[in-house]
Amino acid sequence: MDLPALLPAPTARGGQHGGGPGPLRRAPAPLGASPARRRLLLVRGPEDGGPGARPGEASGPSPPPAEDDSDGDSFLVLLEVPHGGAAAEAAGSQEAEPGSRVNLASRPEQGPSGPAAPPGPGVAPAGAVTISSQDLLVRLDRGVLALSAPPGPATAGAAAPRRAPQASGPSTPGYRCPEPQCALAFAKKHQLKVHLLTHGGGQGRRPFKCPLEGCGWAFTTSYKLKRHLQSHDKLRPFGCPVGGCGKKFTTVYNLKAHMKGHEQESLFKCEVCAERFPTHAKLSSHQRSHFEPERPYKCDFPGCEKTFITVSALFSHNRAHFREQELFSCSFPGCSKQYDKACRLKIHLRSHTGERPFICDSDSCGWTFTSMSKLLRHRRKHDDDRRFTCPVEGCGKSFTRAEHLKGHSITHLGTKPFECPVEGCCARFSARSSLYIHSKKHVQDVGAPKSRCPVSTCNRLFTSKHSMKAHMVRQHSRRQDLLPQLEAPSSLTPSSELSSPGQSELTNMDLAALFSDTPANASGSAGGSDEALNSGILTIDVTSVSSSLGGNLPANNSSLGPMEPLVLVAHSDIPPSLDSPLVLGTAATVLQQGSFSVDDVQTVSAGALGCLVALPMKNLSDDPLALTSNSNLAAHITTPTSSSTPRENASVPELLAPIKVEPDSPSRPGAVGQQEGSHGLPQSTLPSPAEQHGAQDTELSAGTGNFYLESGGSARTDYRAIQLAKEKKQRGAGSNAGASQSTQRKIKEGKMSPPHFHASQNSWLCGSLVVPSGGRPGPAPAAGVQCGAQGVQVQLVQDDPSGEGVLPSARGPATFLPFLTVDLPVYVLQEVLPSSGGPAGPEATQFPGSTINLQDLQ
């Protein structure tokens, strides 16, 4: 249809400038049979806050409107509203420029016979028109024409949300979303801001993006991006100016928030310790440390007597009563634990899977935990955070955990609430840990090994080395540093094998049979050695062998004192030197106390004894009459003799497993010949002399087994000797040459004299030990013969040797290491110097000085 010509002049906006509705005008006349009217509307552009229209009436030609001062686009719309209630025809609009065309895109359809039927109530005709290639939405509601055009993308980003024009409807919202294709509107501005967050990623809203790979943060300003980059670099440029604080922050806002804490540090004061806190919450948390044992909140559930410190803990506990139907059960096979929360079940499952994701980052710690709470509790140890202090006056102890303080508080009450549940045991303890240690005594096996007090006058038995050690310190006044042998795990002896004080009547021949070689019908030396190694350290009471040590030797002799055990370990391939504690030869002799003669001394086989690793030692200079001589002694190579006397007690020889030790030191031809005539060891058991030692080494070497002496109370303990033996076994026999060179070097420097030899009718003097002959006489060796394979040499080593401090130890290919313990008094006589000129004779065997008794080194 053809539209009437539009006026070329723009229209004035009217009294209100801003898009609001104009002054109230009279409502349009009801649609009736009157002729159609023309309506003049002023349409505003989007620059003025959105499209809008103000209706106006005109009869006849419209007057020219006044000019508008604004720069916004305005155009005139002429409407023709038909009579009879038909749908109003949406007239096209045209800008006030000559020559522009109006294209009506949509209009109400009319029937063939006339106007269309009137629309139903509440239905407003709407359509779309295109003006100068711009789409506009047209809506006519109650005589008011509303035009709207969606803003372009560039306009949407620049236009700020403004209050929408108030239409005549009562429920029209005031703030519309500026995003394209979104027509939502909100009554309040903050609602629109929240809604705009859903349009994240819009172009131009966050142009400053983080350049780091993997970081998708974007910001509206460059300052915020710069502040964000500092978090990547771990920079904290804003430091607290308060002295002693030293904290730093990434932003000035965090620093200001921190400074408020300094300003409020003295607001909340603890009434107990006068400590101040910035917040009431921190004060309440601190006050719980003073009243931790008090649990004022009790569960009201019937049958539940649990108490809690805080109300929140009580409420958390109540869920266990009211949510029993929602328990989470552990699905691990064999575990039936249930939890009221899924998070607690998740933490519990980590105990089955071994997952411990929370790792302590402290230096050289490495502890891991299943939950963050346990990790935070563990960090208190590194920070020395002892927040739980004992409230008892004068105590002052503090703890890192509340349960530790609770256990400590019981000690102030004087009660022992933890009672042993075993029937018949009425032991009570103040700590649960003490009850746990006590309960292990009841579950020990009946046949568990027991250890006996090593003091000869004490017969106490113990089930653990700890109790035995405590007994030695408490009852026998032993110092802690003198009891290292009790630390060894092999110091326990089966109680069935301990000798009783009644087994004290033994003869000298019984003692020899006790250390006799392996019988012919035995399974072999290797098997015997393994049994000795597996059996541990055995103990023989000194009173059980007192008769063999001197007949009437009293056990409580004041010159001897309490005797420590002797540990015997076989070593046979180390040449003697000053670095070696004690070296004995083939024949080890037990000397009697008091005056002795050749016939009273019993010879013990060194091959059966093995190596002597630890001996008690005591200086007997205060008792010069302890060991004297009433006869002349002559040197003679004695051989081990077997006892033909029946043993009075057959159980004592069984205490020590007999071990056969093959000698590895060569003997001289003359000595070998004498051995054959004196019932010595067969020559076939001796290896070639060229295998281990040279000529000088042979002169200083011992016989079958090398015996190493170490005081039971010195720094070189039995345990260390055993460990060194193991190390030597790994290194091999490489220390033999070094020991020989050390010995030769000391001889050349004058620090050590070669062994002195004196031959007489009945004895040999070899080194520093006087070895009387056995009961069977034999031919004396020729004069000038050195101590060979069957000689005896003794060297004493102090607690701090001049060597490298490492106890030499070696093991030959056919040598075994039995660990044996014997309570035997051993006497080492003073070295007898050779007489100036003249042959060795009886006068050279006297004892000019005092003696040394190998007993306890206190």
From Swiss-Prot:
Origin: domain of life: Eukaryota
According to its record, what are the GO cellular component terms? nucleus
Where's it found, cell-wise?
Answer: Nucleus
Q: Where is the composition biased (Polar residues)?
A: 675-687, 847-858
Sorted alphabetically, the Gene Ontology BP terms of this entry are: positive regulation of DNA-templated transcription; regulation of transcription by RNA polymerase II
Instruction: Tell me the protein's name.
Output: Zinc finger protein ZXDC
Renumbered residue ranges of the record's region Interaction with CIITA: 781-858
Crosslink Glycyl lysine isopeptide (Lys-Gly) (interchain with G-Cter in SUMO): position given as K660
